[in-house]
Structure formats: structure tokens, C-alpha cells
Amino acid sequence: MKLFIILGALNAMMAVGTGAFGAHGLQGKISDHYLSVWEKATTYQMYHGLALLIIGVISGTTSINVNWAGWLIFAGIIFFSGSLYILVLTQIKVLGTITPIGGVLFIIGWIMLIIATFKFAG
């Protein structure tokens, strides 16, 4: 599905941008702890952006579970990385409670991809 390729490319691109912003724009302006949180958000966004690219490539040849995997991983990026970015910029700690929702969405997305693989392989 072209949409997942676009979403994957956009997320990978944004991860490069947020990584550069963290390294050059935030360093020295926030604590090392928050800089580490920012880096984790960037890393997970990149990994899962690449996953969306792969899902986009294979989604036309497999089951609906691949599409579910893509949407769950995309939502995971928003909840996980998005909440961490906002947490770092605002330092509103309650936003950290949203982050695990993104982690769970990532995990379910990966499980759906595994299920799709078994269904496709027969």
C-alpha cells in the first residue's frame, strides 16, 4: 500500500530531523536525562518508520493483518515517540503515562505482522 510507504518515509525523514534537532538544538538546553528521552523517541520513530516502509512494500501481497500491523505501528509512533517529544519540550511528566500505550501498539503491530507471515506462508 503506497500510503504505508509514504508514512514510513515521512517518519524516517522526521526522525532524522528530530535527531539533528536533539543533537544540535537541545544539547545544553535540557538535562542529559531529557536528551536521552529525546534520543529514544527518535530511535523508535526511525525503526518503526522503516517497518512501515517494509509493510508498504509487502502489503499488496499478503493478508489484511499486514494492514492492521501498519496502522498499529503508525499509531504506536504517535503515542510513543510523540508523547516523548512533547514530554521533553514541555517537561509535563504526566505525558509519560501515554508512552506505554505506544509501546503496546508497537508490540501488537509486530504480532500482527508475524500472524500475517504465517497466514501468507500457509
From Swiss-Prot:
GO cellular component, one term: plasma membrane
Domain of life: Bacteria
Membrane topology: Multi-pass membrane protein
Pfam families membership: DUF423 (PF04241)
Regions that span the bilayer: 3-23, 46-66, 69-89, 98-118
Localization in the cell: Cell membrane
Keyword Membrane applies: yes
Keyword tags: Cell membrane, Membrane, Transmembrane, Transmembrane helix
Primary subcellular site in the record, as a coarse category: membrane
Keyword Lyase belongs to the record: no
Family: Belongs to the UPF0382 family.
Protein name: UPF0382 membrane protein SAB0533
Organism of this sequence: Staphylococcus aureus (strain bovine RF122 / ET3-1)
